[in-house]
């Protein structure tokens, strides 16, 4: 048995913590490996790794992953870890999350490197990602550690198993009501939740659920590369409070040959209602695809067997969405040749031509699409990578939604609020060192309801390689925002957005058609 070491930390880290001090701190620190918690409480003990005040006056605390079986329990700032290697178990359904930086509400925090290999400060979880994302990534790392390193040339996962949705169900609890520092991670300047951070966590949780579903306990299967293919529409059903506890629950709902759909629910209970359905703030459907980590080809994954009535209903709904996605891809080119489509295209371009040819006579309540554009450019850094070494998809979603918000803010002239993610496409991976350009614009506005005008935004990510004189689209994001009723009452006028080129008009029609359901198709090939 390993005895607890360290003493309680009394001081809070200042925001101006110097790198030289961190390096001095690291020179005294030898990380202690840890294992997931055992089902037996008798085989666990507390291993908080902390610093003496004489060694460092500015200690750092970071998220620590605590894995345990349901029912969910709320965590405190020091938890127990299993020290018995034989007690390793499959990760539990709820890794709790603690704040990264100590506050006056937190007396102490355990520090753990999560690996026997010393990590540079830039790779410490919690420094660049949210506490939730790092908790989930460490949970996945524990899965790898459980089965050990694969052989030099392990066999493919030829013997598939059938799992129930319950076997992949995972939940995360945010103690926002009691954890001051955790709240600060998710608070925006207007004292509301940062939607971008939440999207980042949703992607991380979906990835963990996908990994749990695809992992067999044979220890010989070749690890799969699981990537986000797309995100379906997610609608914010009610505002999310920054001061109330929050949870995210998700599970695999549908499986194809090499793809799967994962549904996540963001839950926040209010005192006004006792109905469980009223606690659902947001529902998201992520599609993941599996690739063989060695060959890069599509890999067959474990199947799913819905058991309860609700699981069977979710499977049918996901199956319909999958058929719809394939049908839309199949008929998109045919639609563009139809006479009705050409007429709609010309109608959209009519007002744009007035702006270009007769600008003095153009509608003053309209604006050209190109005049709503914003752009971000940055180099993708190592700190933004996921466990596979590529840029984390959740990070890209966060940057995209924050740019989309900035676009609507400058377009409307008031602070807008997020309503929904219309769709996200992950077309190609983004690697460390890539020069990424995010280009946003208001595609169109919906002004039929004067009390709640809708602003539809497109964000396109381009991987640019100046040395090769190339630029490729890696991601497409579509978001919807609105303005508050107070601004409308004060006389705010949201302008109509018009395209000026045929290419812009096609993008508008493509997005509008994506929001319109089509008849069912018999096209049912697997991804």
UniProtKB/Swiss-Prot annotation:
It comes from the Eukaryota. Keywords: Hydrolase, Mitochondrion, Repeat, Transit peptide. Its EC number is 3.1.2.-. CDD domains: BFIT_BACH. Residues 1-75 form a transit peptide. InterPro entries: HOTDOG_ACOT (IPR033120), HotDog_dom_sf (IPR029069). PANTHER family: ACYL-COA THIOESTERASE, ACYL-COENZYME A THIOESTERASE 9, MITOCHONDRIAL-LIKE ISOFORM X1. This is Acyl-coenzyme A thioesterase 4, mitochondrial. It comes from Humulus lupulus. The gene is TE4.
């Amino acid at each position: 048995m390993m005895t607890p070491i360290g003493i309680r930390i009394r001081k809070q880290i200042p925001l101006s913590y110097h790198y030289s001090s961190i390096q001095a701190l690291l020179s005294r620190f030898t990380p202690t490996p840890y294992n997931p918690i055992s089902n037996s409480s008798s085989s666990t003990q507390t291993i908080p790794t902390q610093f003496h005040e004489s060694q460092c006056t500015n200690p750092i605390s970071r998220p620590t992953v605590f894995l345990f079986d349901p029912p969910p329990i709320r965590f405190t700032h020091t938890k127990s870890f299993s020290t018995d290697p034989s007690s390793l178990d499959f990760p539990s359904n709820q890794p709790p999350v603690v704040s990264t930086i100590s506050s006056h509400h937190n007396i102490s925090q355990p520090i753990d490197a999560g690996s026997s290999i010393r990590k540079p400060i830039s790779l410490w979880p919690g420094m660049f990602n949210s506490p939730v994302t790092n908790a989930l990534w460490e949970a996945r790392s524990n899965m790898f550690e459980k089965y050990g390193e694969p052989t030099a040339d392990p066999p493919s996962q030829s013997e598939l198993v059938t799992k129930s949705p319950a076997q992949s169900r995972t939940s995360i609890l945010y103690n926002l009501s009691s954890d001051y520092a955790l709240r600060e991670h998710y608070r925006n300047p207007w004292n509301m939740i940062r939607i971008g951070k939440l999207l980042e966590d949703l992607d991380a949780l979906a990835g963990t659920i996908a990994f749990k579903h695809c992992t067999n306990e044979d220890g010989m299967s070749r690890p799969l590369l699981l990537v986000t293919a797309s995100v379906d529409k997610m609608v914010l059903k009610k505002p999310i409070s920054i001061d109330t506890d929050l949870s995210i629950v998700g599970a695999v709902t549908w499986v194809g040959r090499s793809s799967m759909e994962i549904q996540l629910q963001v839950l926040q209970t209010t005192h006004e209602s006792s109905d469980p359905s009223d606690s659902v703030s947001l529902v998201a459907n992520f599609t993941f695809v599996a690739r063989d980590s060695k060959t890069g080809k599509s890999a067959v994954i474990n199947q799913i067997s819905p058991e309860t009535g609700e699981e069977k209903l979710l499977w049918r709904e996901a199956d319909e969405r999958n058929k719809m996605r394939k049908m839309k891809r199949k008929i998109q080119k045919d639609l563009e040749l139809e006479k009705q489509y050409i007429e709609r295209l010309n109608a959209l371009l009519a007002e744009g031509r007035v702006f270009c040819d007769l600008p003095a006579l153009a509608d003053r309540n309209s604006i050209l699409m190109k005049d709503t554009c914003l752009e971000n450019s940055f180099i993708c850094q190592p700190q933004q990578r996921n466990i596979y070494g590529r840029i984390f998809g959740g990070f890209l979603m966060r940057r995209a939604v924050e740019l989309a918000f900035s676009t609507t803010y400058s377009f409307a002239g008031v602070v807008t609020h997020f309503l929904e993610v219309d769709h996200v496409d992950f077309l190609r991976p983004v690697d460390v060192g890539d020069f990424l350009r995010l280009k946003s614009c208001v595609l169109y506005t919906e002004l039929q309801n004067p009390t709640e005008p809708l602003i539809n935004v497109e964000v396109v990510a381009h991987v640019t390689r100046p040395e090769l004189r190339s630029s490729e689209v890696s991601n497409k994001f579509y978001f919807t925002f609105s303005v508050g009723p107070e601004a409308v009452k004060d006389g705010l006028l949201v302008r109509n957005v018009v395209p000026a080129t045929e290419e812009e008009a096609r993008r508008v029609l493509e997005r509008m058609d994506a929001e319109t359901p089509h008849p069912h198709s018999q096209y049912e090939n697997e991804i």
